[in-house]
């Protein structure tokens, strides 16, 4: 009988794509997937390790499986493999800390999972740690992959890694330097997905605005280089190529870095009707003191000008962003400036996080760490402000006619809403799933709309 494998996928959409690739390779090798852990010969946990909360969720998921094996809820001889960012980040420590785990793999070993499982089952492994140094792997259009998203929406990972050195972020140390796929390869994957019925292509990477820059030959890009198709493939040239594909679909931009935006990129979004009027631009703060300490290579005036230019060039666009509160050295003046900025720009979609002190980052050893009570208070103040603005934004939509993509019976999303991140729209049950529809908003509670 073929081996049966269960998989738990944690973390972001980029990690979800890695899970899809693992499943694709397992199926190609003749193994069977199961959603029921108690029936699995092998359990795989694809982990996140971005912040403390993600690490704890990953450890809890691993230990839940260990306890289930011990108390008889899962097979006693079931094997456990830990994959993803937690394994990569703590590759030296985890084998000793988690002796119950049968193998550890990182992002570079996801295509080798079937062979590793075979070795684990045959008890031929010499070392439980299969992770080999820095990450270099990048998928291509033909990579075996079983999509875990609804049939009408898909993620395309256009690059891996990150060349930024944000003081709070561990990702470059986990995922390695930025590595772009070719534009032809991305377009080919998109064409295949659209032919299969996909209506929404979500472009993802650690930083999609850096796309193509690592392949430029005229001069080496830096952390402030702007999107520029005259120097080679870029996000702007990719959007134009994707927009030219036949069919009715959205192209959604997630994970852009403000430092790389250019007039060309803004113009490409405005000129391409298939690009959703939605951009994700994590700003993190507005105070120059904080932006400098975070090493975001931007400043407050630059950010304000960028936002005004985007809204002027692309009327009706939704700007999604995130902020960090309680970063080391943040003063009450810095916090107040952030609050006033949020009030002034009234982002269509926004989230806030308290600073997570991550060992291995530059921020970990910074002086003037903010007390946890102060962080919590500032977080609560910002959350209340964002909630009020969300309510006001929702009320402004009542009476408007909007285009939605139906995700499930009675549930849809607008152009302003990314899957599993933003809001939803309650729509008539008769609307066909996986198709676009035009509806009129009749009620709103924050980002959650009702329409008919």
Swiss-Prot record:
GO terms for molecular function: 4 iron, 4 sulfur cluster binding; aspartic acid methylthiotransferase activity; metal ion binding; protein methylthiotransferase activity. Residues 148-392 form the Radical SAM core domain. Binds 2 [4Fe-4S] clusters. One cluster is coordinated with 3 cysteines and an exchangeable S-adenosyl-L-methionine. It catalyses: L-aspartate(89)-[ribosomal protein uS12]-hydrogen + (sulfur carrier)-SH + AH2 + 2 S-adenosyl-L-methionine = 3-methylsulfanyl-L-aspartate(89)-[ribosomal protein uS12]-hydrogen + (sulfur carrier)-H + 5'-deoxyadenosine + L-methionine + A + S-adenosyl-L-homocysteine + 2 H(+). Its main location: cytoplasm. [4Fe-4S] cluster 2 binds at residues 162, 166, 169. It is an enzyme of class 2 (transferase). Residues 3-122 form the MTTase N-terminal domain. GO terms for cellular component: cytosol. The keyword S-adenosyl-L-methionine applies. Pfam families: Radical_SAM, TRAM_2, UPF0004. SMART domains: Elp3. Residues 395-452 form the TRAM domain. The keyword Ribonucleoprotein does not apply. Its EC number is 2.8.4.4. [4Fe-4S] cluster 1 binds at residues 12, 48, 85. It is found in: Cytoplasm. GO terms for biological process: tRNA modification. Catalyzes the methylthiolation of an aspartic acid residue of ribosomal protein uS12. HAMAP family: MTTase_RimO. Belongs to the methylthiotransferase family. RimO subfamily. This is Ribosomal protein uS12 methylthiotransferase RimO.
